[in-house]
A protein has these predicted regions:
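Non-catalytic beta/alpha edge segments that cap or flank active sites
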Residues: 1-174
């Protein structure tokens, strides 16, 4: 895990979607953490929304962002568990052109050190769609911190070697 100091640093435009039946944007600590973290790294917040745990509302928002040339990365938080209404994987997986299986695998490995075997109930996932990277993480602020600090931050750093996702997301207007 090295950084190429000679590589130009490119910052990306990121949209955040919180999926919750109980939060508002004012009480959404997970989305607020992600926004602060991405801005501290120099990335730009393209948009931020909150929807209830409804497959069609999630698809509508994410599909709009996938088509938007101003959105290069999407991070969703919430809806990845096993309760009756958790439906982020069912809503968003069909939108992926390519699945990034290693994301969920690595998240659960990192999460195991924090919450033990409860990590098997995480259905977090990631994929690429129309040159947009999409990361779907659990709704707890702790899980968002694990995903950001352990995986997403480095993968959105264009100087991170041997590879990163910045090289896979392209400005759609080009």
């Amino acid at each position: 895990m090295a950084h190429d100091a000679s590589a130009p640093r490119r910052f990306v435009k990121i949209a955040i979607l919180t999926v919750s039946d109980t939060r508002s944007l004012d009480t959404d600590t997970s989305g607020s953490f992600l926004q602060q973290a991405l801005e501290e790294e120099g990335h730009h917040l393209a948009d931020r929304k909150l929807v209830i745990d409804d497959i069609y509302q999630m698809r509508a928002v994410v599909s709009t962002w996938i088509a938007d040339p101003e959105v290069e990365v999407i991070i969703t938080t919430g809806g990845t568990g096993f309760t009756g209404r958790d439906s982020t994987p069912e809503a968003l997986s069909p939108l992926f052109d390519k699945h990034i299986e290693g994301f969920g695998e690595l998240f659960r490995q990192l999460s195991y050190d924090e919450i033990g075997t409860s990590t098997v109930q995480s259905r977090c996932l990631a994929g690429l769609s129309n040159n947009t990277a999409i990361f779907c993480v659990p709704g707890s602020t702790g899980a968002c911190k694990t995903a950001w600090n352990g995986i997403i931050r480095q993968q959105l750093d264009s100087t991170f070697q041997p590879c990163n996702f910045v090289q896979h997301v392209r400005r759609k207007s080009q």
